[in-house]
Amino acid sequence: VNEIIHKWYSNPAKALEEAKVKRKPVMLQFERDNCSGCRKLYSVTFKELEVEKEIFKYVIPLRVNILKEREIRRKYSAVWTPSFYFINYKGKLFYSFSGYLPPEDFRIILRLGVSSFLVPQGKYSEAIEILEEGIRLFPENPRRPELMLKLGMAKYLKTWDNKMFRREMDEIRRRFPDSAIARMWAWEDENYTP
């Protein structure tokens, strides 16, 4: 059987080295003993095959104990477990999230973290692809407006089409009027319709 065994890194230096070689972000996870969110993450979320596939497709996973790895904890001001930090091979932070996530939400946060790594590098098409996939896969998830906002930003930065970005924001306001993202409408004409 040619089964691929996926392994999380526990050594930050080795994970950063691998990230440099593979040109992927590191997804740093802080854990600790007696963390109920960590236990549920391992028994529910990380048991799902699609979650595991996507982790190893998109990131270099690194897991460290928040109480034992003081230097790295201090660098990111980490205080909670589980928590996730998407960083480049130099250790620069691009996105973070704290708390337990069920499988679908984790897959969305993974996409938000990876796209936050890709966009500053000008890899707009890659970011757009991963965000559009998330929107297709999780049409009813309450985190969808976050995906839509990041998608609108990536498209805008790729094309500099302001009207397109306003249409994306308007769709968020129409479909998810109570979301925090819908409240980010920045234009004076409150009743704008594309």
Describe each PLM feature range:
Residues 8-25:
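A short beta-strand-turn-helix
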Residues 78-114, 118:
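Non-catalytic, surface beta->alpha helical segment in thiol-disulfide oxidoreductase systems
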Residues 22-35:
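Short active-site neighborhood of thiol/selenol oxidoreductases, capturing the structured segment around
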Residues 127, 164-165:
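Single-residue signature of alpha-solenoid repeat helices
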Residues 74, 110-140:
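Alpha-helical segment of the N-proximal tetratricopeptide repeat
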Residues 144-157, 180-194:
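TPR/TPR-like alpha-solenoid helical repeat scaffolds
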Residues 4-10, 30-32, 45-70:
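Thiol-based oxidoreductase modules, predominantly thioredoxin-like and allied folds used
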Residues 49, 96-100, 134-145, 172-186:
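Short solvent-exposed coil/turn linkers within tandem alpha-helical repeat scaffolds
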